[in-house]
Amino acid sequence: MKQLYRKLIPLLIVFFTQFSFAHTTSDKSDLYDQCVDHTLQKLKLDKINNTIVQSCSNETKAVYKKQIITVLDKIRQESQQESQPDRYLNILKSQRLWKSYVDKECDNAGTFIGSPMYSYCPMQEYRKRVDQLREYVDL
């Protein structure tokens, strides 16, 4: 058990140090950061905690999920206009595979890094996916 703690503690310190640094240096226009800042002010707290991470991650992920749906709809429309139904179907297949990957990868992150990752990891992956899908359309 001691050996596990000796390996786990440095990993957690590195994770939370990087997480804290990323939070303080990131773009303030980021939805997640805005949520965290607003919640800290609203609750009159000085530091972020796991509940705030979970709440803001879930809230931000919901926004990205809507954006993904919007972009997928745009891809569907473009595919119809260009008579390329396979294009849309292939992207839907990759979307399902991507979702399975995110679910498993973020479950691993939560298990091995810590519980905040169960919500923070999917939010990050959804943001990346929005950017990735936008490359496929003329927005």
State where each predicted segment sits.
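N-terminal alpha-helical modules
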Residues: F21-L139
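N-terminal signal peptide c-region/cleavage motif recognized by signal peptidases
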Residues: F15-F19
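Bacterial N-terminal signal peptides that target proteins for export
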Residues: M1-I9
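Intrinsically disordered, low-complexity segments enriched in polar/charged small residues
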Residues: L11-L12, R134
